[in-house]
Amino acid sequence: METIRADEISNIIRERIEQYTREVKIVNTGTVLQVGDGIARIYGLDEVMAGELVEFEEGTIGIALNLESNNVGVVLMGDGLLIQEGSSVKATGRIAQIPVSEAYLGRVINALAKPIDGRGEISSSDSRLIESPAPGIILRRSVYEPLQTGLIAIDSMIPIGRGQRELIIGDRQTGKTAVATDTILNQQGQNVICVYVAIGQKASSVAQVVSTLQERGAMEYTIIVAETADSPATLQYLAPYTGAALAEYFMYRKQHTSIIYDDPSKQAQAYRQMSLLLRRPPGREAYPGDVFYLHSRLLERAAKLSSALGEGSMTALPIVETQSGDVSAYIPTNVISITDGQIFLSADLFNAGIRPAINVGISVSRVGSAAQIKAMKQVAGKLKLELAQFAELEAFAQFASDLDKATQNQLARGQRLRELLKQSQSAPLTVDEQIMTVYTGTNGYLDSLEIAQVRKFLVELRTYVKTNKPQFQEIISSTKTFTPEAEVLLKEAIQEQMERFLLQDQV
């Protein structure tokens, strides 16, 4: 029979005491007072931060937005149907953040960066705060590189630069999203990563954008963040910030990015819903007082970074829908005042068959020719002026019966210039194709053609130059200038093609 040795027992007890570490966890908790309509009011949570994530007993996550004297107003990231009054809530100590990585390219995700395309999880090691401060003045440099959209009307007269914020504004069904998707398609081979954020859109519209991008191989460099019309208001409010965080990840890694918000007015409506339910005082059009800050802190994150930070860029293209052309409503005026210019799409032009329906007269880019290559500046200088004069003359010509020859010629030229700006959807043009198109129009080579023949002639001219004068494209891409040599080549091509075209026409 073994004897029990007291010293061994005491040694074991001493070892166990030494190994014992007592973990004390202090958790900031509260109790649900009221829940409903995507909002919960919590008693307690004394040390919660503004914007901190809180976790409910059944797993729902919320964001603390209203810090009041006797309760905390929390917006829920989900339906919150299982949350009960009296259940406990704990503060997580974290601000909303999302995982980020290269693996997100080609994927469709929601506002919490979770995949919704049914293609499995996305691996990532890094994370970024959904809301992070915009780069300061010293960290930026002025915009000087063009972001080509592939649309002649924009690239020649309302140029967009890398790091700029350009608003696309117009009534519903005027082709706003088409301008944005064409811009994405045109970034193929340009080393630009695109992020498309769909806020409060129909799921069918988002699916259509995804399928267009997939067909053209553009999803390889695109991320789509989608919160459709049936998503909770909180997630619609967060979606643009999620998109911005993903674009920033690439921007700070010395890459060029372009982000499209479609559309911030839906985000403002979601924010208005949340604010009214939180009993914040309503202002103009029932929006809360800080709705300007909602959009300014989002769009200020677009930047062209300085050389010290690697010269990455983030170009923002917000799309805002107007009601029957009223750009003086609250959200449109706010976004116009934040952005560096706007592209107006007109329902009248769209219905008249001018597509893209860009109203060149009232569209503007505040970066201007700094965002154009020299060749485009040389060629497109007088295009906008001629179109503006034509628009004025056209209005006048409706009342005048007998016009002199010079006025008739100017009207004829203007009609042909307007014709050359027309483009099919998903058919962006390269810079050299745009330069030859604009040059042909502004130098009067189209004046002898019927208006109906203009587009056919231009399509054939582009093909002819590509096959018979490849040096033209080489000169433009290597020197970025419209040299005398390039002009001679183009003149030859136009004359040769014009002869062929007129011969075909006679046959």
From Swiss-Prot:
This is ATP synthase subunit alpha, chloroplastic. Its main location: plastid. The keyword Ion transport applies. Pfam families: ATP-synt_ab, ATP-synt_ab_C, ATP-synt_ab_N. One of its GO terms (molecular function) is ATP binding. It is found in: Plastid, Chloroplast thylakoid membrane. F-type ATPases have 2 components, CF(1) - the catalytic core - and CF(0) - the membrane proton channel. CF(1) has five subunits: alpha(3), beta(3), gamma(1), delta(1), epsilon(1). CF(0) has four main subunits: a, b, b' and c. It is an enzyme of class 7 (translocase). It catalyses: ATP + H2O + 4 H(+)(in) = ADP + phosphate + 5 H(+)(out). Keywords: ATP synthesis, ATP-binding, CF(1), Chloroplast, Hydrogen ion transport, Ion transport, Membrane, Nucleotide-binding, Plastid, Thylakoid, Translocase, Transport. The keyword Isomerase does not apply. Produces ATP from ADP in the presence of a proton gradient across the membrane. The alpha chain is a regulatory subunit. ATP binds at G170, D171, R172, Q173, T174, G175, K176, T177. It is a peripheral membrane protein. Transmembrane segments: none annotated. Belongs to the ATPase alpha/beta chains family.
